[in-house]
Design a protein with these regions (language model features):
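Condensing-enzyme catalytic core mediating Claisen C-C bond formation in acyl metabolism
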Residues: 1-26, 153-168, 243-308, 312-315, ...
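N-terminal extracellular/periplasmic Venus flytrap/periplasmic-binding protein-like
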Residues: 13-14, 25-34, 42, 158, ...
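Conserved beta-ketoacyl condensing-enzyme motif
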Residues: 24-143, 219-232, 304, 327-347
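Conserved catalytic cysteine-centered active-site region
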Residues: 26, 57-112, 122, 157-160, ...
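Short, well-ordered amphipathic alpha-helical segments that serve as non-catalytic structural scaffolds
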Residues: 28-43, 67-71, 96-99, 178-185, ...
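Active-site-proximal alpha-helical scaffold in enzymes
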Residues: 87-118, 126, 186-213, 273-280, ...
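Flexible glycine-/small-residue-enriched beta->alpha junction loops
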Residues: 111-184
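Active-site pocket-lining segment
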Residues: 183, 215, 294-297, 301-379
């Protein structure tokens, strides 16, 4: 069945705020609501005109389990506008867009607010199983004697916290952390530490240049409860260089590994939202789209090499549209790790790998001047629920700023999946 394009009317994101060893100033819903208000205020329709609100979130707080509905209500969409939440790990925001696309294509919706949010700095700190069992025993103890006997069984090790974020970033099937899967890719494709650090420094340099040139005008500034303003991504480093990055020690494969904090994406809080519409809604509401989503693909692969997800997801789109890697004007590949992005590029160049895993000859060399032109998650950050929506939105913004036409946004997904979206701009169309 032919894919019916869906229009992107507008989009916005929050600044991406680096987690700094303490809960950040905003809950995940706060990030999305402030971003959404800025986005909806500039539209010609009322929030109540939306068909639905769909939000991707990987780590909602316990009091915001259906965070999509919470956000819809706090944005003033009214009781009648449904809101719901999706979760596909790192691609949760992209999944929200795809869910909106499917609702629009089937005729159930015609105007949808979709995207993602996460406040990873507020990821839960959990109790160990031993502590939970002890608390259950304490709660069931009757009388001073039982209480005292239970108290004697409490050990200091029971109080050791369990970091929820670390558990979430570890694959329960293969038992590897996301960083360890990146080490697998660096080893498989012979990626040197120097290459990873050089790529990472370039991500910061491109992000700095983008900030200086106003390339991130999709950002809506945030204000916290104290009145402090957050206007731009705060994890971009002016002093990043391959030489400084080379001093950092490996994190996931000590002491011989290649993956460090410096060549990995940052743990970040942030939100990104887009307004999607049908052709009929564009006409009836006299909307001015910024672009179209032309195709979507999801893929599954070995969780131990999950970082190759962009290759598995975007290649079928290229095949369907008879495109080569460099027939697209720009690419956004989410930078979970420098090793992961470079492994994707190496895989496309490897004829034996392509024939074994894709059933195709090598696709060739992607021109890196087309890739992540304003930096990526290594510099900007990776709020898991938001990143998939961010790369789609920024791809359209980057294309429009350069008067270009088509691009691909692709993302790897913990658990061994990949997602990709082919987009084009609408500038100059009547």
């Amino acid at each position: 069945m032919a894919f019916e394009p869906v229009y992107v009317i507008d989009g916005a994101r929050s600044p991406f705020l680096k987690a700094r060893n303490a809960p950040g100033p905003f809950a995940a819903s706060d990030l999305a609501v402030q971003t959404g208000r800025g986005l909806l205020l500039r539209q010609t329709f009322e929030p109540s005109r939306l068909s639905e609100v769909i939000i991707g979130c990987a780590a909602p707080s316990p009091d915001e389990t259906n965070i999509g509905r919470v956000i819809a209500l706090r944005l003033g969409c009214g009781n009648a506008v449904p809101g719901w939440t999706v979760m596909r790990n790192c691609a949760s925001g992209m999944q929200a867009l795809d869910s909106a696309i499917m609702s629009i294509q089937t005729g159930r919706s015609d105007l949808v607010l979709a995207g993602g949010t996460d406040a990873l700095s507020r990821a839960p700190v959990l109790l160990s199983d031993e502590m939970v069992q002890w608390l259950a025993a304490w709660n069931g103890a009757r009388g001073p004697g039982q209480k005292l006997a239970t108290l004697k069984r409490l050990r200091p090790r029971h109080l050791a916290p369990v970091i929820g974020l670390l558990k979430g970033l570890t694959d329960p099937v293969v038992g590897l952390s996301m960083g360890q899967t990146a080490e697998n890719l660096a080893h498989r494709f012979g990626l040197s530490r120097e290459a990873l650090d050089e790529y990472s420094a370039r991500s910061h340099a491109r992000a700095l240049a983008g900030q200086a040139q106003g390339a991130f005008d999709e950002i809506v500034a945030l204000a916290d409860a104290k009145g402090d303003l957050y206007a731009q991504d705060d994890g971009v480093r002016q002093d990043s260089s391959p030489e400084k990055l080379a001093r950092l020690k490996p994190v996931f494969d000590r002491p011989w590994g290649n993956i460090t904090a410096g060549n990995s994406s940052q743990v970040t809080d942030g939100a990104a939202l887009l307004v999607l519409a049908s052709t009929q809604a564009v006409r009836s509401l006299n909307l001015s789209p910024i672009g179209r989503i032309l195709d979507v693909q999801w893929a599954g692969l070995d969780p131990a090499v999950m970082g190759l997800g962009p290759v598995f997801a975007s290649t079928p789109i290229l095949q369907r549209h008879k495109l080569g890697l460099n027939d697209l004007d720009l690419w956004e590949i989410n930078e979970a790790f420098a090793a992961q992005v470079l492994a994707c590029l190496a895989a496309w160049e490897d004829d034996a790998w392509c024939r074994e895993h894709l059933g195709l000859p090598a696709l060739g060399t992607l021109d890196q001047a087309r890739l992540n032109v304003d930096g990526g998650a290594i510099a900007l950050g990776h709020p898991v629920g938001a990143s998939g929506a961010r790369i789609v939105l920024h791809l359209l913004q980057a294309l429009r700023a350069r008067r270009l036409r088509r691009g691909m946004a692709a993302i790897c997904i913990g658990g061994g999946q990949g997602g990709a979206m082919l987009v084009e701009t609408c500038d100059g169309e009547a």
